[in-house]
Design a protein with these regions (language model features):
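Sec-dependent signal peptide recognition
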Residues: 2-8
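Hydrophobic h-region of N-terminal signal peptides that target proteins for export
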Residues: 10-17
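Eukaryotic scaffold repeat domains enriched in small/polar residues
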Residues: 17-381
Length: 381
């Protein structure tokens, strides 16, 4: 009987793997539409109140119709109204009821129930109530198995991956999701590109209700990345967001398409157009040393997609992109129901973070030397 059960389970596993391999994980657009009517838009700069005590290391976000800045080194959370004036500050380093011992905040996200999830540079996850009191009953450390270099490890094992860069963290129900990167010497896009583009898992799920790592989602990379690891390694990161129904919207730094998957990560369709005036003539990288020299310098000179944000209030998908060194602006695409309705010029560094009526806001532009913090806000009529 045990033998029968064993072979039955092996059949299910093999069938599931075969089914996944047979899926077209990166479908081509069946219908790609744009409706670029003349829309009036206005962009201005909003200076953020910097009387707060901050390291100017962190990110801006939108939560409950307020702007906030989370300081990753001081572990503080500052809320502002839509005019940039400070409302209140909470969190901090320590063992008090509204403090954390996480060390440094690597990433964070708010859940639909109002909880705040912090992830540290180690494997710690700290959960805070809507009143910003730490909830130790829901906090935990990720269980990461140890293995030595050369030990066999599957491509679908959590231990093979670290959190991506630029880092994305999203939530849906009782799970949070982060993008991945793989830097193991036996498995990475630079040194083992042929295997990587077939087997790379794009996203890791953390099951907060079970305090454990969940699914590794997405298998492989779009065709654009096949055979191009020398030029596309620097531009291989995954950006994504999740809508109210749990559907995933995925884009890659060098790929013009946006891929939609359901909550089980079944591929649905793709859409999207190339941004304007993007210089995608990437330079070849042949050594690890070149990655850290002329490789990363291309972030300032080449065209690539820099962020993707779903705006539930408007049912918009926003995708920002860098154009080139020669251009004086970056770009922002706005999609509604998969249709490109706007592709506009925005200031350099514009990355969308959310909406407070009537403005779309960018992430913070930080100037530590001048002790200044500001955001761009975009109004479309």
């Amino acid at each position: 009987m045990k033998i029968v059960i064993y072979f039955f389970l092996m059949f299910i596993v093999c069938f599931s793997c075969s089914k996944e391999q047979s899926l077209q994980m990166f479908p081509k657009p069946v219908e790609n539409r744009k409706d670029l009517n003349n829309r009036f838009y206005q962009i201005d700069t909003l200076l953020i109140d910097t009387t707060l005590n901050t390291t100017f290391e962190g990110n801006m976000g939108v939560h409950n119709n307020q702007l906030y800045f989370i300081d990753r080194l001081f572990c503080t959370l500052h809320f502002f109204d839509s005019t940039g004036q400070i409302c209140f500050q909470t969190l901090g380093i320590g063992r008090g009821p509204t403090e954390t011992t996480i060390g440094q905040i690597y990433t964070h996200t708010f859940l639909s129930n109002g909880y705040l999830c912090l992830q540290g540079t180690t494997d710690d996850i700290h959960m805070f109530t809507p009143g910003y009191k730490i909830d130790y009953s829901k906090s935990y450390r990720k269980n990461r198995k140890r293995y030595r270099l050369g030990d066999p490890i599957g491509y679908d094992q959590f231990e093979l991956y670290s959190m991506g860069y630029p880092l994305v963290c999203r939530s849906y129900k009782n799970s949070v999701f982060t993008n991945n990167r793989a830097e193991d010497p036996t498995f990475n896009y630079f040194e083992t590109p042929d295997v990587f583009v077939q087997e790379f898992r794009n996203i890791t799920e953390q099951r907060l209700d079970k305090k454990q790592t969940g699914r590794l989602l997405g298998r492989g990379m779009p065709d654009l990345y096949k055979g191009n690891s020398d030029t596309h390694y620097i531009f291989s990161s995954t950006f994504f967001d999740i809508d109210n129904d749990g559907n995933f919207y995925i884009t890659y730094m060098a790929d013009s398409l946006i891929y939609k998957y359901d909550k089980d990560y079944f591929p649905l369709y793709s859409f999207g157009f190339e941004g304007k005036s993007m210089d995608k003539n990437y330079e070849s990288i042949h050594t690890v040393e070149e990655i850290h020299t002329k490789g990363i310098l291309q972030y300032k000179t080449k065209g690539y997609y820099t962020w993707l944000e779903y705006i539930p209030e408007l049912n918009y998908i926003l995708r920002s992109y860098s154009k080139s060194k020669q251009e004086i602006s970056d770009g922002l695409q706005i999609y509604e129901n998969n249709v490109l309705i706007a592709d506009i010029d925005v200031p350099k560094g514009f990355r969308p973070i959310g909406y407070i009526e009537p403005y779309l806001f960018s992430d913070a532009i930080l100037n530590q030397d001048k002790m200044r913090m500001y955001v761009y806000r975009l109004k479309i009529k």
